[in-house]
Amino acid sequence: MDFLHRSGVLIIHHLQEDYRTYYGFLNFMSNVGDPRNIFSIYFPLWFQLNQNVGTKMIWVAVIGDWFNLIFKWILFGHRPYWWIQETEIYPNHSSPCLEQFPTTCETGPGSPSGHAMGSSCVWYVMVTAALSYTISRMEESSVTLHRLTWSFLWSVFWLIQISVCISRVFIATHFPHQVILGVIGGMLVAEAFEHTPGVHMASLSVYLKTNVFLFLFALGFYLLLRLFGIDLLWSVPIAKKWCANPDWIHIDSTPFAGLVRNLGVLFGLGFAINSEMFLRSCQGENGTKPSFRLLCALTSLTTMQLYRFIKIPTHAEPLFYLLSFCKSASIPLMVVALIPYCVHMLMRPGDKKTK
């Protein structure tokens, strides 16, 4: 591993030295890969375009991030910004100097990359959905058009994934091999759901049972390793020790914060998609109207951006996790049930007048 780490440090140092002027773009691409954008941007948009794809997106994102957490606990991956300070392989303090940024100091283990894994699994779902839609509307003779569409969409996919990976390496929060593992892992999870039909038709009990299983397995795995004297939160004090600015340390980057956020979203989706409001609006007479879907998409996207202003207190971890779960659960409830139902009720008076 020292060889991978040392080679990775040289790559990071090269990127920071020669491509410092591209920091704005790389920081933007790092934000593009942020798993939280799945729930605040991609999901609200895609659910209104295609409910099945939007539902699958949540399942893929949640299960993918859960696997990411388990693998991080197993692989014990270091992050460059603290490894360079802890290692003793450089003689006479001759280690390269790695610059840190406001988004560098994540506190969980580094392998595989959560940003790379989340980005690849969700964009894989979007690309395959777009291909399925376009192919179904092409004539059988349009082989050239099909190949061009296929090439274009997958080129966009890889361009985004490579940019996200480079951005995470540039800010010294991941080694190159960690982002590669993340991309591969995300694609495998997304491909597995391509062969899992009926996810969009799951009952409330399936959502609840899945939530309970994911939570108990993660908690049980954590407690089991604690019995063997293995502290799975080993990375948190190291991150706090070597982060250049204490203000850059955020509790929402800890392993359990991501788990609670994902379980909240899946819990909320289960209730929303099996609610009476969803059945009356999205599954009702207005559900297929372009105007209804457009209004729902715009309102959902606007509302999700307002969510960013809701700050959860971090002084007490149990309270933070509880409020984070509730905030996350409210996202699909708003996007899937409440907003479509309100739009449906607003459109009803106009429909009645035309009859």
From Swiss-Prot:
Inducing factors: Up-regulated in islet cells cultured in hyperglycemic concentrations of glucose.
Predominant localisation class: endoplasmic reticulum
Coiled coil: none
Metabolic or biological pathway, per its Swiss-Prot or TrEMBL entry: Carbohydrate biosynthesis; gluconeogenesis
Membrane topology label: Multi-pass membrane protein
Keyword Membrane found: yes
Residues binding substrate, per UniProt: R79, R168
Entry comment on modification after translation: N-glycosylated; the non-glycosylated form is more unstable and is degraded through the proteasome.
UniProt-listed CDD domains: PAP2_glucose_6_phosphatase
Its job: May hydrolyze glucose-6-phosphate to glucose in the endoplasmic reticulum. May be responsible for glucose production through glycogenolysis and gluconeogenesis.
Name used for this protein in its record: Glucose-6-phosphatase 2
Organism: Mus musculus
